[in-house]
Amino acid sequence: MYRHPALVPLSHEHQRLLFVCRYLKKDAAAYEGFPLETQAKLAYIVKVFQEVMVPHIQKEEYLFESCAGKDAELDALIQELTAEHQQISRMYSALTENTDLEDAMDQLARSLEEHIRKEERLLFELLQQKQAGWLDRISWEN
């Protein structure tokens, strides 16, 4: 699937986050070097959210704000994705308070996976179709 160069870094982050989703699910296969204990998984997700997810969401919010008001279809999708960002953030924040941590991580993983796939299949395609000129002007700082 073609990705505009401005979207490639976000897609790479999505790939890393999709691995995290697979790892956090209840039915996760064993991955070499990744423990299956619930507390170890929690420590891993905390690290990944701080290092990858927070800056990733900031980049996407920049995209959302910059594209707002230019296309009704894009606006509706952005509104939906923004609500999902908020829900995923709430799910992450509530992990330590949850009585069934394994189930909470599984739900977070499944929600995040669905969200990422929506961004890749819908948002990025719409941006490439309707905002290609704007995407040409984006340069991400690492």
Set out the residue ranges of the language-model regions.
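Small-residue-biased structural context
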Residues: 1-142
